Amino acid sequence: MKKEELKKKLSPLAYRVTQENGTEAPFTNEFDDFFEKGLYVDIVSGEPLFTSLDKYQSGCGWPAFTQPIDKKMVKEKRDKSLFMERTEVRSSNADSHLGHVFTDGPLDKGGLRYCINSAALRFIPFDQLESEGYGDYIKYFS
C-alpha cells in the first residue's frame, strides 16, 4: 500500500507509529490495560501477531506480550536511536514498526517482553475470529 493510501486509512498516530517508527504515550493507549480474549493483528496489513494468551501486565505503559503468535510473523532489527541500543520489532509482511522486544519478561515464559504500541494493532475479539476471517487461529485458544 502506498504512503498516501496509508495516510487515508490510518489515524495520524497509527501512521506515525507504523510508518515513521513513532511511539505513543505510555499508560494512555488503547490496549495497555486491556485483557479480553482474542487476537492482535497488524493495523496496516491484518497479519496476525499476538494472542491475548501471551499478553501480561508488565507495568511499562504499553501492551506487553511474552511471544508472537509465530516468530515468522515478526522481524527484529537492531535500533540504536535515542542514545541506546534496543531491538525493534516490525511486522514481517507490511514492515510496520510495532515496538521493541526486551529481555526482562517473565522467566517462566521465556524471559522476553514484546513492548508493542497499541496504535500498531487491531484487536479481533475471540467470538469474531471466524467472521473476521481468522478462524484458523481459534485453535490457539483451545
From Swiss-Prot:
Q: Name one GO cellular component term.
A: cytoplasm
Q: What HAMAP family does its record include? A: MsrB
Q: Which organism is it from?
A: Lactococcus lactis subsp. cremoris (strain SK11)
Instruction: Give the main EC class.
Output: oxidoreductase
Among Pfam families, the record links this protein to: SelR
Can you say what this protein is called?
A: Peptide methionine sulfoxide reductase MsrB
Q: Does the keyword Electron transport apply?
A: no
- Gene from which this protein is expressed: msrB
Q: Which UniProt keywords apply?
A: Oxidoreductase
Q: Which residues form the MsrB domain?
A: 3-126
The EC number(s) attached to this protein equal 1.8.4.12
Q: What family does the Swiss-Prot or TrEMBL record give for this protein?
A: Belongs to the MsrB Met sulfoxide reductase family.
Gene Ontology biological-process entries: protein repair; response to oxidative stress
Entries under PANTHER family matching the protein: METHIONINE SULFOXIDE REDUCTASE, PEPTIDE METHIONINE SULFOXIDE REDUCTASE MSRA_MSRB
Citing just one GO molecular function, the answer is:
peptide-methionine (R)-S-oxide reductase activity
Active-site residue numbers: 115
| Catalytic activity entry | L-methionyl-[protein] + [thioredoxin]-disulfide + H2O = L-methionyl-(R)-S-oxide-[protein] + [thioredoxin]-dithiol
**Claim: Oxidoreductase is one of the keywords in the record:** yes
